[in-house]
A protein has these predicted regions:
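Thiamine diphosphate
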Residues: 1-143
Length: 143
């Protein structure tokens, strides 16, 4: 799916798929494509969004995450198709805190609750992980 971005899997290595100076989305799995689509949509509003794809949580590419998240002035958003508990968002937050890097930080993830059943597009919209909802959340956080 990420072939058009020149992506090649390397164990434990995160990869910048898109550079951006206003926002950095750190994402994994399905949400990486959504992040790229949201970045493209936000560009129409002159919001420059970078996307860092994290292919593995263990080992986690801490050096790349800390370096990219530490760039001054950017909102850092972790987007994952996982619960807010025990996933990429918590791992990134812990590593940034441990490194003394404190960007504006938000998470896009599934709530820590029993979730409804249904068609995936409907659920993704309901729980805020559709492309449109990701873009809308980021616009709201930048206000």
């Amino acid at each position: 799916v990420l072939d058009e971005y020149g992506y090649r899997f390397e164990l434990g290595r995160a990869q910048m798929l898109r550079d951006g100076r206003d926002v950095l989305i750190v994402s994994s799995g399905l949400l990486t494509m959504r992040a790229l689509e949201a970045a493209q949509a936000l560009a129409a509003d002159r919001i420059d969004v970078g996307v860092l794809h994290v292919s593995t949580l263990k080992p986690l590419d801490v050096a790349t995450i800390v370096r990219e998240a530490g760039k001054a002035g950017r909102l850092v958003v972790v987007a994952e198709n996982h619960s807010t508990i025990g996933g990429l968002g918590e791992a990134v937050a812990a590593e940034l805190l441990g490194a003394g890097v404190a960007p504006r930080f938000r998470r896009i993830a599934l709530p820590d609750a029993f979730l409804d059943a249904g068609a995936l597009p409907t659920l993704h919209e309901r729980y805020g992980i559709s492309t449109a909802r990701i873009a809308a959340s980021i616009k709201g956080w930048l206000r």
